[in-house]
Structure formats: structure tokens, C-alpha cells
Amino acid sequence: MADAFAGTWKLVDSKNFDDYMKSIGVGFATRQVASMTKPTTIIEINGDTIILKTQSTFKNTEISFKLGVELDKTTADDRKVKSTVTLDGGKLVHVQKWDGQETKLVRELVDGKLILTLTHNNVVCTRTYEKEA
């Protein structure tokens, strides 16, 4: 099922991203740059390993993981998190935990688009990606 997510995805719409970044503690200057950036997300499947690359003029990141296996990761905004990704009802659900906090990043395919919903406390951000040819 995760195979459906494979491909190169370009950000085309973003709602409430600045408020989300503020909620998780991202500083003002970083938020300003990140808000203007339109990243490309590349999802690759290699056996039971998923590789998630995010590329932008701001920063490039890469995470590789197996579903359900908790990893120690450093996020693009330098948070040290415990990170777990699962497949739930056709959605890739990514949970990050740090300092008693938790954020959830849910990726789902809707009408051929990749919808990323980020939630922290009561703040919800939606980012929409279209698949590149």
C-alpha cells in the first residue's frame, strides 16, 4: 500500500504553516524562510524501507525508516525527536515526540494529490503536493 506514495511531489498549496511552525517552537527567522519555500518531496520504497527526502532552497533532509519502528531523528528545524511512521487506513502516519510534546504528520492520497496534514496541539496545517511526471 505504501507503494502508492512513491514518486516526486511538488508543493502547490499550504495553509496555516506559519502557525504550525510557531506552535512547535520554530523561531521567527526560520519561519520566514520556510514559509516562502516550496519544497519537493521524494518518496522511495526499497523493500520494507521507505525513504522520504525533502528538497528545497532552504534545506534538504532525508529520513529512511521501516513502518512501525521508532527512530531517533533530528528534524529540519533541529528538534531531536522519537519518530515512528505507520500505515493506517491507507495513510502514512508519522508521529514525532520530544520534550513531552507530540506532533502528527499524516500523508494521504486524495484525487491524485498528496495531502500532508500536520497537527500540534490544536493547530492544524494542510500542505498539498502534486506528483511530477
From Swiss-Prot:
InterPro entries per UniProt: Calycin (IPR012674), Fatty_acid-bd (IPR000463), ILBP (IPR031259), Lipocln_cytosolic_FA-bd_dom (IPR000566)
Modified residues (Phosphotyrosine): 20
Entry's Gene Ontology BP terms: hibernation
This protein's name: Fatty acid-binding protein, heart
Family of the protein in this entry: Belongs to the calycin superfamily. Fatty-acid binding protein (FABP) family.
Record text about domains: Forms a beta-barrel structure that accommodates the hydrophobic ligand in its interior.
Keyword Cell membrane set for record: no
Modified sites of kind Phosphothreonine: 8, 30
GO cellular component: cytoplasm
Organism (species): Myotis lucifugus (Little brown bat)
Residues reported in the UniProt entry to bind hexadecanoate: 127-129
Modified residues (N-acetylalanine): 2
